[in-house]
Amino acid sequence: MDDFDRDLDNELEFSHKSTKNVKVHATFESMNLKPDLLKGIYGYGFEAPSAIQSRAIMQIINGRDTIAQAQSGTGKTATFSIGMLQAIDTNAKDCQALILSPTRELAVQIQNVVKHLGDYMNIHTHACIGGTHVGDDIKKLKQGQQIVSGTPGRVVDMVKRQQLSTRNIKMLILDEADELFTKGFKEQIYEVYKYLPPSVQVVVVSATLSREVLEMTNKFTTDPVKILVKRDQITLEGIKQYHVQCEKEDWKFDTLCDLYDNLTITQAVIFCNTKLKVNWLTDQMRKQNFTVVSMHGDMKQDERDSIMNDFRTGNSRVLISTDVWARGIDVQQVSLVINYDLPTDKENYIHRIGRSGRFGRKGVAINLITKEDVATLRDFEKYYSTKIREMPMNINDIM
């Protein structure tokens, strides 16, 4: 957390659609947190709350349904984790909080954050995700898990098998809500929700909250507190955005090869829109003797875990992926993102480039475009009130 840019965070402005008169807590001490939780917060590297934390944590602790929206890297995960850990009764072994995420990697990452923050609290937490052995889940859940972080499909399965008791769940957290509410997950979330006690507190968290998502949250929340960052600030100010005009699609590959030496200075993620393209690009790069790893949703879970682990530890430097990786995955060293394909929707653009400057860190995003992409790029600029400049001839000038 020591690279967090406090000045940038202080400049965040909140939307006029936010709930008025939300009290701002400038220190963690002023929140009257459990001493063991406070110890975990400082141990994790936080010194003072970020803008979103200073507003949302106490609302969650006070039991209010909460909708929190801020860009990637502002401490959203810690916001709901701290609120949740404060509310947990450590003497009761039943599941008391359920977190749903759109990807397995994100569910595991959240579990790790909860573990670290709750380090001194003797909290039992489990990641309940697809692609792992069902028997292992059942065994873990039988041991008693106060907090479960999972993906909707596996959680529904465990609830229906009566292996995950929902009787004492007092908090439901929907992370990356805009992704969760897309068609694939919507029905599963409704399915989980109907098993929960009527008094359950709902916390909705996301970097982007479209109008459709806000309408959807009305079905789950009662008089929610809304803490919303102004949209034109959602693009992290610390991220420099560029485009490279390629005459045709085939030339993108040559451009990427030219850039490769600069990719490995730190670590880079290259995004493609399809699994086929990820596999193709990975093969092409390797044929040219470039070292890359790749990841997409069709891979087995243990393979995805191993790739993520290598990337986290810095053993691999360049990752080629679909949007499965774009959602909230935190690898501190990533300072360059390349969109080999522009994302198909505006919301995913922020999720992708949000990787490259987490928590106030500086970063660079490079978009490889053909003339067919120019209109889409202009749309992104307009939507986020930002400027995506042409990349200078010498990439070293921007790295």
UniProtKB/Swiss-Prot annotation:
It is an enzyme of class 3 (hydrolase). GO terms for cellular component: FAL1-SGD1 complex; nucleolus; preribosome, small subunit precursor; small-subunit processome. It holds the Pfam family Helicase_C. Disulfide bonds: none annotated. One of its GO terms (biological process) is maturation of SSU-rRNA from tricistronic rRNA transcript (SSU-rRNA, 5.8S rRNA, LSU-rRNA). Its EC number is 3.6.4.13. InterPro entries: DEAD/DEAH_box_helicase_dom, Helicase_ATP-bd, Helicase_C-like, P-loop_NTPase, RNA-helicase_DEAD-box_CS, RNA_helicase_DEAD_Q_motif. A motif (DEAD box) lies at residues 175-178. It catalyses: ATP + H2O = ADP + phosphate + H(+). SUPFAM superfamilies: P-loop containing nucleoside triphosphate hydrolases (SSF52540). ATP-dependent RNA helicase involved in 40S ribosomal subunit biogenesis. Required for the processing and cleavage of 35S pre-rRNA at sites A0, A1, and A2, leading to mature 18S rRNA. Belongs to the DEAD box helicase family. DDX48/FAL1 subfamily. PANTHER family: ATP-DEPENDENT RNA HELICASE DBP3 (PTHR47958). This is ATP-dependent RNA helicase FAL1.
